A protein has these predicted regions:
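A residue-level marker of the well-folded mature domains of exported/periplasmic proteins
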Residues: 1-350
């Protein structure tokens, strides 16, 4: 769950891993759909605020981009989604290049391009001023502290040119927002709909994407529960169980048989609807009913959280898992990793 088996360079699915046995499935969210939503959210904001968003009036709407992990398929998709929507992406082997641009104040980088946007009879240039992978010295990616340091470096050099801040997730986005963007009234866009980011929308955070973590967490444990019970994998998902738990395909999730993957569908969270997302750890009402312990007896499960320091995984995903495990009669041992080495988790198996 959460990180789909894939090629770290291309993002191509590892179908061999996904077909390990009959009970192997992936649970996550629709990365491409969410990435497109984030990109469109940023573009819509720029169009709606074009007259005021160009802070120094140079006709260039400049943005900086915090990239979580250059080898992570979700990070790749989000970088591509933003660049595609804004028109700054360039083709690389049939897909938008997701390579960090480094510093690109003069627009000379090869992995991105300047785009043109016509709004209200005026033509603006959109430029990715800088982007980098937020990896710390210990090797941990999606690192919020590194993002906070990066925005400090960027603003010291070309702060008056930064009109928008974009991040592959809210952890990094909030770090940059709190370090600089909030005080300078620069809209910041993230991903995950973490509770602090949703609350910050009232203070100028531009928006975020809810990856329907409540549905993801349920699906993660439900697939496990069904495998342990030896019932059809769709039980309690697309087909109601005896308690009445059931999701709506096409609205709450989609299933790809070819990819053996369940994907929660994403929702854009902006100033118009953020109050509906203030409690990120609330179970989804459609699948909130307790299973009968006589038919689904308590089972012990070992579940690893590969990066326990990640804001989304620790503050949203794991609490949701913990809220669902009792409903599904699962006794779960949650093992937190460091986001760097597999042995940090596997060494605990003995």
């Amino acid at each position: 769950f959460n990180r789909q088996p894939s090629n770290s360079s291309t993002g191509e699915l590892d179908k061999e891993a996904l077909s390990f046995n009959k009970d192997t499935y992936y649970v996550g969210f629709d990365a491409n759909q969410g990435a497109e939503l984030q990109g469109q959210m940023v573009l819509d904001y720029i169009k709606a605020n074009a007259a005021t968003i160009d802070r120094n009036g140079d006709g260039v709407i400049g943005y900086v981009l915090a990239i979580g992990d250059i080898g992570h398929n979700d990070s790749i998709a989000r970088t591509r989604g933003v660049r595609s929507a804004l028109g700054t992406g360039v083709d690389a082997n049939g897909a938008v290049d997701s390579t960090p641009a480094g510093t690109n104040v003069d627009g000379s980088a090869k992995v991105v391009q300047d785009a043109k946007l016509d709004v209200g009879g005026k033509t603006y240039t959109i430029r990715e001023l800088a982007s980098q992978e937020m990896k710390n010295s210990a090797g941990a990616t999606w690192d919020a502290a590194t993002a906070g340091n990066a925005i400090g470096t960027w603003t010291a050099s070309f702060g008056d040119q930064i009109d928008v801040v974009v991040s592959n997730n809210d952890g990094m986005g909030m770090s940059m927002f709190n370090a600089w963007a909030k005080d300078n009234k620069v809209p910041t866009f993230g991903y995950d709909a973490n509770s602090d980011a949703v609350a910050a929308i009232a203070e100028g955070y531009g928006g975020t994407i809810s990856q329907h973590a409540d549905v993801q967490a349920y699906l993660t444990l439900r697939v496990l529960r069904n495998a342990l019970d030896g019932v059809d994998v769709d039980t309690g998902i697309g087909t109601a169980d005896e308690a009445g738990n059931c999701l709506t395909e096409g609205e709450d999730y989609r299933y790809s048989e070819e990819e053996r993957s369940y994907y929660a569908l994403n929702v854009a969270v902006t100033a118009e609807n953020y109050q509906d997302f203030t409690d990120s750890t609330k179970v989804y009402d459609k699948v909130s009913k307790q299973l009968d312990s006589s038919k689904s007896p308590t089972k012990k499960v070992w579940l690893d959280i590969y990066n326990a320091s990640d804001n989304f995984l620790s503050s949203t995903y794991q609490p949701l898992l913990e809220n669902y495990d009792d409903l599904l009669n699962l006794k779960v041992d949650y093992i937190g990793g460091d986001g760097q080495t597999e042995s940090n988790i596997t060494n605990r198996l003995g």
